[in-house]
């Protein structure tokens, strides 16, 4: 239903940026997850990726093309000079852009409220994974236009925390 999914994203990359998307079979290259060849303007994605992972990688490529300069400026303007921190911050901001591109704030919040924050409906509507949707729900903290203050915690089967996120405190 929105530009942030599958074939629409591939079409967007082709029409707006001249980038062709090619799905790589395991027989062609079993090690590839994603790769962008700037010279040929081909973005390669593994056939082994789930549909939602492919979507996110496509949106991440859009983020890299459309927001890279702005993100670099944000990092520079905030004097982030650490060789360890700057790349992590850049990746986080690119991923945030990708999620926002797939699930635009106002549209996503309206849909979340309409469907009473039903994660499965939102997953279907935005062609995103459980983790992508729940992570985006934690981001809905725009002053004056907030969503429910969600907290995100990802653990492995043994209970080890591998990811935590909250913007609400």
PLM regions and their residue ranges:
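Conserved binding/catalytic microenvironments
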Residues: 2-169
């Amino acid at each position: 239903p929105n530009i942030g999914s599958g074939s629409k994203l591939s079409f967007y990359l082709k029409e707006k940026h001249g980038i062709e998307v090619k799905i790589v079979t395991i027989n062609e290259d079993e090690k590839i997850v994603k790769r962008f060849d700037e010279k040929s303007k081909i973005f390669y994605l593994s056939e082994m990726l789930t549909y939602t992972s492919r979507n996110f990688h496509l949106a991440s490529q859009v983020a890299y093309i459309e927001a890279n300069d702005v993100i670099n400026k944000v990092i520079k303007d905030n004097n982030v000079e650490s060789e360890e921190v700057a790349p992590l911050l850049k990746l986080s901001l690119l991923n945030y852009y990708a999620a926002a591109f797939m699930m635009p704030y106002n549209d996503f919040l309206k849909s979340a409220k309409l469907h009473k924050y039903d994660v499965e409906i939102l997953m279907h509507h935005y062609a995103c994974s459980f983790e992508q949707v729940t992570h985006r729900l934690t981001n809905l903290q725009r002053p004056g236009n907030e969503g429910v203050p969600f907290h995100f915690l990802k653990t492995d089967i043994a209970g080890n925390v591998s990811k935590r996120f909250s913007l609400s405190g």
